[in-house]
Amino acid sequence: MVELNRRTFLSGSVAAGAVALFGTEAAHAAGAVKLPAKWDETADVVIVGSGFAGLAAAIEAKKAGASVVVLEKMATVGGNSIINGGILTATGCPQQKKHGIKDSPELLAHDMLVAGLYLNNPEKVKLVADNALSNYEWTVNELGVEYNPDAIGQEGGHSVPRYVFTKNGSGSGIVSKEVEKLEKLGVKVRTRTYVKHVLRDDTGRVLGLEVLEGYRFPKTGTGKTKFIRAKKAVILCYGGFSRDVEYRTMQDPKLTAALDSTNQPGATSELWRETSRIGCAQVQNDWIQCTPWNNPKEKGMGIGWTFAQSGAAEYGLWVATDGKRFVNELANRKVRADAIMVLKGEGKSAVAICTKPNLKAFEEARPGMLQKLLEQQIIKEYNEP
């Protein structure tokens, strides 16, 4: 993780002080929200969202000496982070060295730029790539996260194997450790707290938030109004909007209600709309990630992706229902997802195939998962005559 001093911390905040705007006059014209006569609470830093990013920001802010408030609209912490696959890119990690894999931050940055069609912000790409190892080390040394010590995997779009994954195979292996660390520092995430408005002064400077405490998702307007002042920064880590069909189809019309989402139910657009109202510079909202490895028989993320990606994509084949291979299984996820969309338009489906001998690495990395997938009939086993 990048070492943040107070100045860097504040200058890097999404909505700290003079927020990144398309122009404060234009944002102001979009409709001002009246400031409260009195603030109910004041903190140095107020963080919205309790996924990986929000919790990490809270930990570092607290360690830097700030008073911290963390808000989460759902009843439980973690957002999408807690239900993801627990995978982390860790260029230069011990697992890579154990397997003799040559890698570098420069190669990671190159892969990111290629996968992003060079639409990425090069400075941010470099920041991520240069700190991939320190990020991994922070989760291990600071939080005590446990990763599989022997396994290293190769995601689509990456030139070499460079991802590690938590021992429990879930993002909860990271989130739970972040929550533990935060509580040791004296900060508890405030769940069921809905952010209604970002509050600013006449110059456009962010002063704090209007929230609803005791909010009951998805019941609009539930909860008690409270005003929280942020003396130094409001940090927005509220995640995506893929569960909001109306909003996502405004961005990408092909992503209709016919398509399910792997996101948790609270991945909706309220704060995307609110930050747009105040003029925050939102970039590439219509570049919505579609995952190519999920099983349509499962709801949400499920577990079928483990076979499709960590099994068949790395050690087998993806074919269409006509038996023809249709894509490079280790292409980036957009290339693969787009190829599946084409198949869908042709009335075909994608099938992930792998021979059992080739699944040895998968079984070693995720003990018991293959049997679980078979028992739940998420995958099928065929024996040659």
What are these regions (language model features)?
Residues 54:
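N-terminal Rossmann-fold NAD(P) dinucleotide-binding loop
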Residues 216-223, 229-299:
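Glycine-rich loop(s) and the adjacent beta-strand/alpha-helix scaffold that form part
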Residues 130-225, 231, 245-247, 295-296:
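Conserved redox-cofactor binding core of oxidoreductases
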Residues 90-128:
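Glycine-rich active-site loop/strand segments that organize a redox cofactor
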Residues 272-274, 281-385:
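An anion/pyrophosphate-binding glycine-rich loop and adjacent beta-alpha core
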Residues 39-51:
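Beta1/beta-strand and adjacent pyrophosphate-binding region of the FAD-binding site
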Residues 1-16:
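N-terminal secretory signal peptides and thylakoid transit peptides that target proteins
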Residues 64-81:
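Glycine-rich FAD pyrophosphate-binding loop
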